């Protein structure tokens, strides 16, 4: 049981870490390249052998795990982040039921993977633009849409919007993994203590 919860927490950390970048980009127009790369790589690693492998190792999720630790300890400063996380976890349910959108996203991710082979960098602006467009043309049609609040100056810039959408796609990918590991919204009520303990284990 511990192993399942441990893996589920990694997936949830992936969601939160990607969404933290969404919040940061929306407010400042800037992102953390390492976090963006971890998020985009997780989108491209469709057939990874384990949740840890999806993110290239637990260390790459340190930021997300720390955010979860703060949340479980009632010390999270950004009160919009939990709401955004809940919205993405709910979006995952609508996404997975729409087989045509799932197929389109899968095809788009495969094309992006080939593009990464050419650029050699998953965090390259061209890749972010491609994945951002993929999100806009597919997932953004699901209702209700994810609403991102931030600085209008940055939210009016095409490159910023593309990166935000790419990060939302990455968050959704982690949400799908979370659900595949039997994640459920009731976990936050029924297994919150176990999830907090798993978060602490991952941070050691």
From Swiss-Prot:
Please give the name of this protein.
Answer: High frequency lysogenization protein HflD homolog
What domain of life is recorded for the organism?
Bacteria
Keyword Membrane listed: yes
* Keywords associated with the record: Cell inner membrane, Cell membrane, Cytoplasm, Membrane
GO cellular component terms listed in the entry, alphabetical order: cytoplasm; plasma membrane
**What is the recorded membrane topology of this protein?**
Peripheral membrane protein
- State the Pfam families in the record: DUF489
Which segments cross the bilayer? Answer: none
Q: Which organism is it from?
A: Xylella fastidiosa (strain Temecula1 / ATCC 700964)
Q: What is its main location?
A: cytoplasm
Where is this protein found? Cytoplasm; Cell inner membrane
Q: Which family does it belong to?
A: Belongs to the HflD family.
């Amino acid at each position: 049981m511990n192993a399942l919860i441990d893996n589920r927490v990694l997936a949830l950390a992936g969601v939160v870490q990607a969404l933290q970048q969404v919040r940061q980009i929306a407010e400042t127009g800037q992102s953390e390249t390492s976090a963006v790369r971890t998020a985009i790589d997780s989108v491209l690693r469709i057939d990874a052998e384990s949740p840890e492998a999806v993110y290239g190792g637990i260390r790459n999720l340190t930021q997300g795990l720390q955010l979860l630790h703060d949340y479980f300890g009632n010390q999270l400063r950004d009160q919009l982040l939990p709401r955004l996380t809940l919205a993405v976890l709910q979006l995952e349910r609508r996404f997975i039921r729409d087989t045509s959108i799932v197929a389109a996203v899968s095809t788009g991710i495969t094309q992006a993977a080939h593009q990464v082979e050419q650029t050699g960098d998953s965090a390259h602006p061209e890749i972010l633009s491609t994945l951002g467009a993929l999100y806009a043309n597919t997932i953004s049609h699901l209702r209700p849409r994810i609403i991102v609040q931030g600085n209008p100056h940055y939210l009016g810039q095409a490159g910023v919007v593309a990166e935000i959408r790419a990060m939302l796609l990455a968050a959704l990918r982690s949400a799908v993994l979370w659900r595949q590991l039997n994640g459920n919204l009731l976990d936050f009520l029924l297994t919150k203590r176990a999830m907090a303990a798993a978060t602490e284990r991952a941070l050691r």
